[in-house]
Amino acid sequence: MAKNTLSSRFRKVDIDEYDENKFVDDQLQEEPAEPQGPDEAEVDSLIRQGELLRAFQSALRNSPVNSKNQVAKERTQAIVLKVLTSFKSNEIEKAVNTLDPNGIDLLMKYIYKGFEKPTENSSAILLQWHEKAFVIGGLGSIVRVLTSRKTV
């Protein structure tokens, strides 16, 4: 009998390393060390100055959609919810009209995320936002939000 058959070196080879169908997560690249999302101080300042439309656009800018950083996502959700609840009901339509189709989808994602964790009076306000966003984005916007893998 040969001496090589008693060896167990073959068990140390990772055969999955050579599989061409192996799943590789693209998100594994280095994430930035600083938290992503809108600048909370800037958004708060704009709200205090009464520039709600600029605060709205600033809050939706740089959303951590592709990030796995849950802290940044929750922080951004809180900022967006604060901006959405600051609007008066007659100003909502004007704000929604400033968004492109991707912005409408992003807004709908934040609306549905707000429905998941309701606060004091947020559901009524979010329903108003949902109504106005639905008029512009249509049913396709809802379907895209509910089937999207990129969460906020």
UniProtKB/Swiss-Prot annotation:
Cellular localization per UniProt: Cytoplasm, Cytoskeleton; Cell projection; Nucleus
Q: Where is this region: Disordered?
A: 21-44
Q: Name one GO biological process term.
A: cell migration
List the GO cellular component terms: Arp2/3 protein complex; cell projection; cytoplasm; nucleus; site of double-strand break
Query: Biased-composition ranges for Acidic residues?
Result: 27-43
- Classify the source by domain of life: Eukaryota
Q: Does the keyword Cytoplasm apply?
A: yes
What are the alphabetically sorted keywords of the record?
Actin-binding, Cell projection, Cytoplasm, Cytoskeleton, Nucleus
One molecular function GO term is: actin filament binding
Which InterPro entries does the protein's record reference?
ARPC5, ARPC5_sf
| Cleaved signal peptide residues | none
Subunit-level organization: Component of the Arp2/3 complex composed of actr2/arp2, actr3/arp3, arpc1 (arpc1a or arpc1b), arpc2, arpc3, arpc4 and arpc5.
Q: Which family does it belong to?
A: Belongs to the ARPC5 family.
What's this protein's function?
Answer: Component of the Arp2/3 complex, a multiprotein complex that mediates actin polymerization upon stimulation by nucleation-promoting factor (NPF). The Arp2/3 complex mediates the formation of branched actin networks in the cytoplasm, providing the force for cell motility. In addition to its role in the cytoplasmic cytoskeleton, the Arp2/3 complex also promotes actin polymerization in the nucleus, thereby regulating gene transcription and repair of damaged DNA.
Q: Which PANTHER family match?
A: ARP2/3 COMPLEX 16 KD SUBUNIT P16-ARC
Q: What is this protein called?
A: Actin-related protein 2/3 complex subunit 5-B
Q: Which organism is it from?
A: Xenopus laevis (African clawed frog)
